[in-house]
């Protein structure tokens, strides 16, 4: 028993052992019990040998047997202690495993709580986005309704394009006219969507009869916005041509041009440029590098680069197209002038104004020399050149060109410029002078000279753009009255162009208006003519014997009247506007009929537009 060492320590009262300390003590006790058992086994073995000896000698046998029994009891107690220690160690191991599992579960709970919080945050964010989306949808629905209404107005307010006969020359291509036929409202935007309906057989390679029907169908579907039909048609035809004729056939180049047109209308400029590059390679290899069809494809490719803002890359392509056309057609051909216009637009977007002026002036000389001064291209080129002058601050040169355009449009209708027939810009400047000298009552009213543009081509966007640009130039110069006159005239010309009956009858109406004027009742009478649906100002004819018209409206009232007139115009064109129950003194403020005699009343069968309401006699 002397070798038994128990690892017990005196602990202070109330001290609570930790789990590690208990395990350590248990292991120490177990080791002590193991040592004690070994010692007892050795003693018991010694006693057994002693008993055997005593049985032979017979001395002190009982005492030895008693010691053996005590040792066996001690061995049993030691075995019991060892079993309990092993149970405690196994229990401690199990508790440690349980605690480890408990920690794992706690970690999982923490992760689940974090995920739950993240999901809550995501749900809250999704709910906020859903709320914003619903608000945006509601706003878009309102905007859609508003745009539908504006679309109804625009349907009748679109600028009509003057139809011009196009020569069936082999120098044009189906995509050759990608630049605008009419000037854009924003002079800085020179490149715009072209006219895609030009027949492809007008290009450098004539479309075979077997492809013409397909080409017409594709153009029709593209014009209707049905690209989901037009694109598969083009691709199928392209595959058939490549299979039957080979990739390098000119028919394939033509079909590539048509498919590029459809892609361009979808604003897929990269795909369209890739197709045009393929078409260019085919045409250069089959038709030669100086063929007009190659020039047309180069021009189309330059336009696509321009639409993507790659003006530097587009300029050499356009320059090469110009060189080919000059070589094939001569330097004074109208198509050369058209290419010069396109090149000028590209240079203008790069700020190369000297080159822009040179190209426009040369194109203008070609148009005037080959097509005459009254050709619409002359006015368009002058308008473009004036826009270039405006960008450089050359306001005097721009003003001169704008006045030339308006004067030429006036001469085309009336044949000359005299005191009775003055261009609108002259009236605008006279009105400005009268405004400065405070003699409104003695001036010619806007309504009397505002009808000149009706007899001209009021649907021409060139004239309309010129009116607005010159009005903006006047406003920059501080000529507010003249600017207002031109702006009102431009606005009214657009609205007048919505009524086809008015367009065909206006010259006749103006002819009747020379002698028709309402006579005054007496010295004390006053008849007031208020603006009708499309009125721009209200005027009053004072019965003081002077026979002068006085302006009595304001610009704010004008805008309100114009806004109401647009709604009435849509209802009238849709056939839903109620007809007036009786004739009254109201009518359009243009006063085109003040000069008409009472003996020549308007016929009901004339089909008046919204801007020519019935006007009864003042008697």
Swiss-Prot record:
One of its GO terms (molecular function) is kinesin binding. The modification N-acetylserine is found at residue 2. TPR repeats lie at residues 55-88, 211-244, 253-286, 295-328, 337-370, 379-412, 464-497. GO terms for cellular component: cytoplasm; kinesin complex; microtubule. Residues 32-150 form a coiled coil. GO terms for biological process: microtubule-based movement. Kinesin is a microtubule-associated force-producing protein that may play a role in organelle transport. The light chain may function in coupling of cargo to the heavy chain or in the modulation of its ATPase activity. Oligomeric complex composed of two heavy chains and two light chains. This is Kinesin light chain 4.
């Amino acid at each position: 028993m002397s070798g038994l060492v128990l690892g017990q320590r005196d602990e202070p009262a109330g001290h609570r052992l930790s789990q590690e300390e208990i395990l350590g003590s248990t292991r120490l006790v177990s080791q002590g019990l193991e040592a004690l058992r070994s010692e007892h086994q050795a003693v018991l073995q010694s006693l057994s040998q002693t008993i055997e000896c005593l049985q032979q000698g017979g001395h002190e046998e009982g005492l030895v047997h008693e010691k053996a029994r005590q040792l066996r009891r001690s061995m049993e107690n030691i075995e019991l202690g060892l079993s309990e220690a092993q149970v405690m160690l196994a229990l401690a191991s199990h508790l440690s495993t349980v605690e480890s599992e408990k920690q794992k579960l706690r970690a999982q709970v923490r992760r689940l709580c974090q995920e739950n919080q993240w999901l809550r945050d995501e749900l809250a964010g999704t709910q906020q986005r859903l709320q914003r989306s619903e608000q945006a949808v509601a706003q878009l629905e309102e905007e859609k309704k508003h745009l539908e209404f504006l679309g109804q107005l625009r349907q009748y307010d679109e600028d009509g394009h003057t139809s011009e006969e196009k020569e069936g020359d082999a120098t044009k291509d189906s995509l050759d006219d990608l630049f605008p036929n009419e000037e854009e409202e924003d002079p800085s935007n020179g490149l715009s969507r072209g006219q895609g309906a030009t027949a492809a057989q007008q290009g450098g390679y004539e479309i075979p009869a077997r492809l013409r029907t397909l080409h017409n169908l594709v153009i029709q579907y593209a014009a209707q916005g049905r690209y989901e039909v037009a694109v598969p048609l083009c691709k199928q035809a392209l595959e058939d041509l490549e299979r039957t004729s080979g990739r390098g056939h000119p028919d394939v180049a033509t079909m590539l041009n048509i498919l590029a047109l459809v892609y361009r209308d979808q604003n897929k400029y990269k795909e369209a440029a890739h197709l045009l590059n393929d078409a260019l390679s085919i045409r250069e290899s089959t038709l030669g590098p100086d063929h007009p069809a190659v020039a047309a494809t180069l021009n189309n490719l330059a336009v696509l680069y321009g639409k993507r803002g790659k003006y530097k890359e587009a300029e050499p392509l356009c320059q090469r197209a110009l060189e080919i056309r000059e070589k094939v057609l001569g330097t004074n051909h109208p198509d050369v002038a058209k290419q010069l216009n396109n090149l000028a637009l590209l240079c203008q977007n790069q700020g190369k104004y000297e080159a822009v002026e040179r190209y426009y002036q040369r194109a203008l000389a070609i148009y005037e020399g080959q097509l005459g001064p009254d050709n619409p291209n002359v006015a368009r080129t002058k308008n473009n050149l004036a826009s270039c002058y405006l960008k450089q601050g050359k306001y005097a040169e721009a003003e001169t060109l704008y006045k030339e355009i308006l004067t030429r449009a006036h001469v085309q209708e009336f044949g000359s410029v005299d005191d009775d027939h003055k261009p609108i810009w002259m009236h605008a400047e006279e009105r400005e002078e009268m405004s400065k000298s405070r003699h409104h009552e003695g001036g010619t009213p806007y309504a009397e000279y505002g009808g000149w543009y009706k007899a001209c081509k009021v649907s021409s966007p060139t004239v309309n753009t010129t009116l607005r640009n010159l009005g903006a130039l006047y406003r920059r110069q501080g000529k507010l009255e003249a600017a207002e006159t031109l702006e009102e005239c431009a606005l009214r010309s657009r609205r007048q162009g919505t009524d086809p009956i008015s367009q065909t009858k206006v010259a006749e109406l103006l002819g009747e208006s020379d002698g028709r004027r309402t006579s005054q009742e007496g010295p004390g009478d006053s008849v007031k003519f208020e603006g009708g649906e499309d009125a721009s100002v209200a005027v009053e004819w004072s019965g003081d014997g002077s026979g002068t018209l006085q302006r009595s409206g304001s610009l704010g009232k004008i805008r309100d009247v114009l806004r109401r007139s647009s709604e009435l115009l849509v209802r009238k064109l849709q056939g839903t506007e109620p007809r007036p129950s009786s004739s009254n003194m109201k009518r359009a403020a243009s006063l085109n009929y003040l000069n008409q005699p009472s003996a020549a009343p308007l016929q009901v069968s004339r089909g008046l537009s919204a801007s020519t309401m019935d006007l009864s006699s003042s008697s």
